[in-house]
């Protein structure tokens, strides 16, 4: 009987992520595990089929080979790879020689790697002030954690946990591929080396259960959009393995006044026509409080003033950026009768003489009509 497509076996698409593949396999394994289906040959066959599919699709190199050549990649030795070792790294090749020749090539004595849970991601939204100055925040999220009932063991009674008879507790089995002996994860115990005879009723033997968790997170001063804070061991928990990490990713809300570019801050400073023309000392806000800014006589829209050291000190940097103030000269609106009169008088005074009061305007028209 022809083998079914591995993606079809797990019920996932060919573009499925590693997490999606893991979740699909876990669901099938719990459903068809021999311990939960004694004397059920069909369930045992489905369990083996799912384990075989997961063994290939959970390994990036094997998955790549399978995507290119299908089941032929793992049948009849290394057929389909042009007679060589297509798709296998040098480490894989020498590890297989080591299996045969007693570790002469450094691969025979490798020990099983400790299983590890998946890393998790939490998006935290901050104000600009919080990102620049640092903050402590409490977060709440739901993630797999050690089961409270069985203390993460998968069974309340330690006597109900036995050494796997297929792999004898190693979590690995040897598969013959032509001339070579290849070590693979044991499909019976899923690489754990143990079989649970009487699974915990709360977690069904997995040793973990989804639980709401609350953590206090310290965000360092100077973080920016996309920066991540790593909380070691706070990710997905798994039975008989190491928990993954939790990554808190920073998203900074848009500020009504300041825009950030690396270590520097930018802001628009509105100035009246009179203040821009005559000059004035004004007060402007910064993240540290209000400071004075001197507007020289004749300041134009777009003029930048730099206030050194009023920006941001990025994470892992000893340098503080600057605050750059862009002047925006505002045209007055909703004029009173008196203001309109005065502006008309001013307008007439400008139009009535060849004044140097508008040098850019004069230069523009000179070029236009030359």
Swiss-Prot record:
J domain boundaries: 5-70
CC per GO annotation: cytoplasm
Keyword Magnesium part of the UniProt annotation: no
InterPro entries, per database record: DnaJ, DnaJ_C, DnaJ_domain, DnaJ_domain_CS, HSP40/DnaJ_pept-bd, HSP_DnaJ_Cys-rich_dom, HSP_DnaJ_Cys-rich_dom_sf, J_dom_sf
Binding-site list for Zn(2+) 1: 147, 150, 200, 203
Matches recorded under SMART domains: DnaJ (SM00271)
Domain of life: Bacteria
CXXCXGXG motif repeats: 147-154, 164-171, 186-193, 200-207
Pfam family, one: DnaJ_C
Location(s) in or outside the cell: Cytoplasm
Function: Participates actively in the response to hyperosmotic and heat shock by preventing the aggregation of stress-denatured proteins and by disaggregating proteins, also in an autonomous, DnaK-independent fashion. Unfolded proteins bind initially to DnaJ; upon interaction with the DnaJ-bound protein, DnaK hydrolyzes its bound ATP, resulting in the formation of a stable complex. GrpE releases ADP from DnaK; ATP binding to DnaK triggers the release of the substrate protein, thus completing the reaction cycle.
Entry remark concerning the domains of this protein: The J domain is necessary and sufficient to stimulate DnaK ATPase activity. Zinc center 1 plays an important role in the autonomous, DnaK-independent chaperone activity of DnaJ. Zinc center 2 is essential for interaction with DnaK and for DnaJ activity.
Protein name: Chaperone protein DnaJ
Organism: Acinetobacter baumannii (strain ATCC 17978 / DSM 105126 / CIP 53.77 / LMG 1025 / NCDC KC755 / 5377)
Lineage: Bacteria, Pseudomonadati, Pseudomonadota, Gammaproteobacteria, Moraxellales
